[in-house]
A protein has these predicted regions:
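C-terminal accessory "lid"/substrate-recognition subdomains
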Residues: 2, 7, 153-269
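Extreme N-terminal, non-catalytic leader segments
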Residues: 2, 7, 11-49
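Walker A (P-loop) phosphate-binding motif
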Residues: 33-87
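Short, high-confidence coil segments that cap the C-terminus of an alpha-helix
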Residues: 76-78, 124-125, 141, 215, ...
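Phosphate/Mg2+-binding loops and adjacent switch elements
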Residues: 86-194, 203
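Short, aromatic/basic amphipathic alpha-helical patches
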Residues: 90-98, 232-237, 259-262, 280-290
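Short, flexible loop segments at boundaries between secondary-structure elements
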Residues: 248-252, 289-311
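Acidic beta-strand-to-loop metal/phosphate-binding motif
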Residues: 269-275
Length: 311
């Protein structure tokens, strides 16, 4: 028999129940799509664009949607950007980003398919962009932009909670050469990626002054889908990290917990993301105006060639 260490036995004990949950998740996923997400009717007027990823979170869909909507608007298009209302923090950030931009409107919805058809019938928008509608198989006729960080998932152990994937390649006709010509797969890592997400500035939340690199270590307070990638991007920017405080994506406890952290570390410096900054209420902002809080802004870099061949 092969030798097993205590750690390997522990990992196996943890893996088996997770695999069982992944199998149950897979069954529910297939049933939900068969009963509730049957392919619907295509739009008649607007161009439908879906931005998605296999990852459960942290793939960069929202930053990419910001770039995409600006790109489409710069070409003279009117754009509707649809986001799930559950992601309240992302919606706040998106509305801040596009405040004053008459070419782009942000909509919060529980049903992208229904709202897309309502907007299509209004004939007010040239393009309708869905932030994370990859799993909604009702959205027929869409151009899908898939942000890919790993190889396409093909096995059950890659699904949540064993892995970080929501579905398999075969669920979207992406395996074994069945890829639709209406799917654009953009790699986000590795050599010469099609898309890069880069932190280009870190500014004081209140004064707007730039963060001075090579100063004291900072604490990261983060409620993103992939907080470790956020930390890695900050290190690439030149920031030395002290403590890390991570919260679930879209956590409604973020503000209260962040305030406790500041109270316990009043003289220390903190860096948060734009999305986390957008969710902070006015009371928090007024109360902590003397705190050393910096906001990291991220830019999406896409080559001219890739941008020209998206559609």
């Amino acid at each position: 028999m092969p030798f097993r260490t205590p750690n390997s036995e522990l990992r196996m004990k943890m893996f088996i129940p997770r695999l069982f949950i992944a199998l149950c998740y897979r069954a529910v996923y297939k049933l939900h799509h068969a009963l509730c997400l049957r392919p619907g009717a295509p739009l008649e007027h607007s161009k439908l664009i879906v931005v998605g990823s296999f990852r459960t979170g942290g793939a960069g869909k929202t930053p990419f949607c910001i770039w995409l909507c600006k790109h489409l608007a710069a070409q003279g298009n009117t754009v509707a950007l649809l986001a799930h209302e559950y992601a309240f923090d992302e919606i706040k950030m998106l509305r801040q980003k596009f405040a004053g931009n008459e070419s782009v409107q942000v909509f919060a919805t529980r049903n992208r398919y229904r709202l897309a058809h309502e907007l299509d019938r209004s004939q007010k928008f040239d393009c309708i962009v869905c932030d994370d509608g990859f799993e909604d198989s009702r959205l027929v006729g869409a151009t899908t932009i898939l942000l890919q960080w790993e190889d396409l998932p093909t096995k059950i152990p890659e699904l949540w909670p064993c892995g970080g994937m929501r579905s398999l390649a075969k669920d979207h006709h992406l395996d074994h050469g069945k890829r639709s010509p209406m799917v654009r797969i953009l790699r986000c890592e590795g050599g010469n990626p099609a898309v890069r997400f880069v932190i280009d500035k870190v500014l004081h939340f209140y004064s707007g002054k730039e963060f001075v690199k090579n100063s004291a270590k900072v604490n990261i307070v983060c409620g993103l889908g992939n907080p470790e990638r956020f930390c890695s991007d900050l290190q690439d920017f030149g920031i030395e990290i002290g403590h890390k405080f991570f919260f679930k994506d879209h956590s409604k406890a973020f503000t209260a917990q962040f305030e406790k952290i500041i109270q316990n570390r009043p003289q220390e410096t903190f860096v948060i993301s734009e999305k986390d900054a957008a969710r902070l209420p006015a009371e928090f902002i007024q109360k902590n105006e003397k705190s050393q809080i910096f906001v990291a802004s991220q830019t999406t870099e896409i080559s001219t060639e890739v941008a020209q061949n998206l559609f």
